[in-house]
Amino acid sequence: MKFFLKVSACLCLALLIVTSVFSTTNNDKAFAEDHSYDGKSPYYNSCDQSAVTKEKKWIDSNSYVELKFSTTCKTAWAKVTVTRAAVYNNEADARIVRKTDGKAYTCGSAGGNGVVNKGQTSCYTPMVYDLDPRKAQAQGKHAIPNSDAYNYAETIWY
């Protein structure tokens, strides 16, 4: 009988230890913010109407990227502009990145208007919510003619 009680006690203790190990929460998980403006077009709720350019950075002599910020919606997005009509498809693209959680969108994401293709001059990304203490950065790329490479530029974090 004593042996049975000792075995039962050991099994209960082992079960308790295993249960407590697997039931602890992991606080190291990445935290992705979720805001109603994230992934929406800058034209959503007329956010574009209060847009200011926080920085404009030249990618090369024919293109630049802008970090746009809506003072009303408190959102940011990226816009890339080619100073002449694109001569081929996928010539330029922009990306917006939020620093706090790494959320990022390109012109090709839903809510953007697609990459700069032949005959076009610009594209914009969807928005990320960017109220302080959040910060966002615009990144742009423009194809180098006759190669598979791109020139890149990035703005300040704002």
Predicted feature locations:
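Post-signal peptide N-terminal regions of Sec-secreted extracellular proteins
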Residues: 28-158
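C-terminal segment of classical bacterial N-terminal signal peptides
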Residues: 15-28
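Bacterial N-terminal signal peptides that target proteins for export
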Residues: 1-11
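N-terminal non-cleavable signal-anchor helices
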Residues: 8, 19-22, 53, 129
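Compositionally biased, low-structure terminal segments
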Residues: 4-5, 23, 32, 151
